[in-house]
Amino acid sequence: MKVLFTFLAVAIMTMATLPLKAQQKEAYVVVSNNGTMITFYYDLQKANREGTVCQIEGTSPAWIGTLTKPNTQIVTAEFDKSFQEYRPKRTWRWFFNCSALKEIKGMENLNTSETTEMVGMFSGCKALTSLNLSKFDTSMADNINNMFMECEALTSLDLSNFNTEKVTSMSYLFASCKALESLNLSSFNTKNVRTMGDMFAGCANMTKIDVTFLNTESVSDMKGMFSGCSKLTSIDLSKFNTERVSRMNAMFKGCKSLTSIDLSTFKTTYVRNMDEMFFDCQNLTTLDLTKFDTRKTTSFDDMFGQCKELNTIYCNDKWNCPDPNNKMFDGCEKLKGAVAYNKNSTGGVMANPETGYFTRKTSDGIASQTTSHIATIKAIYSASGQKLNELQRGLNIVRMSDGT
């Protein structure tokens, strides 16, 4: 009987301890009762927390805003010290469209050493004025698309600790960061990056962007890369490798302060889309496109549209534009090549140096006039109206090939 009692006691104790042993720490977010604060935890206390508890793993974050409805309540976010032990595989949209968020505390408690996807993490945080990324580990990240997009109040970002060695996609990374004045990208390793579309689009406060550190040998998409950088006054693209790029549409669209762009190193052999590439570059006066190969390009819509100060486009080739009425030169009022600009002739048919708006450039860099459009003598007459075979001493009446 004593043995049986002892056995039952041990069994009861074992059963009592099983739930405790079976429990595992869990990562979760608590939204405060008034909705103004979210806290990230990794512990066993989820059932005891006050507020709305949200899951992190395997779900779209329940606390964030949506594309059509931002979260305008959350003002503060904090990573609790317990969160140090958690290793998220993705931080996808963790603060997406939290448009009133002003502060993120405890970033040192966020361990991203195993995080591969950081898409849209801070996108739409329009009130956020600073981010402490000094402990941020991006060594495993392969996708950082939209990460800081529309962080409209950020004036600076310290990215010196960013390891981008495995990143393949950076599209919209800093898009619409309207207050950013500068970026130091010297720590960026972009040898594996394939997409940089709209990477700096809408960075309207930057006067200069140093992209000489960017390795673009694998990049195929540069669509809208600098679009809307309206204060950008200069850019050094001498290190850009564009051999694999297929999309350059809207690449410099709206760069209203640029007066020149050196594209002498650009290879456009595989580029298919150049729509709006220089659209609304209002202060560009000259473009040298003599190195451009457009044999595979199929779309040129509004390529030079509204370049109001553009007077010369150097190019020795006739471009084959599938749509001859694509408004390629619309609004280029000062443009003159083989012929002067005509507002009624703005399509791709004018993309040539023979009868269009391109200007030939010789190997020594000197612009040459198209010989077929140099006026020649068609007929010679004496003062009395008699037709002559050659110019005579005295008064001659000469009829030229251009009608003069």
Name every feature range the model reports, one short phrase each.
Residues 386-389:
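C-terminal trimerization/auto-chaperone modules of long, extracellular attachment fibers and adhesins
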Residues 393-395:
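Extracellular Ig-like/FN3 beta-sandwich strand-entry sites
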Residues 29-31, 380, 398:
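A short beta-strand micro-motif
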Residues 132, 184, 382-384, 402:
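Acidic/polar residues in short coil/turn loops that connect beta-strands
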Residues 361-384:
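Residue-level detector of functionally pivotal "anchor" positions at catalytic/ligand-binding pockets or at interdomain
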Residues 20-363:
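Negatively charged
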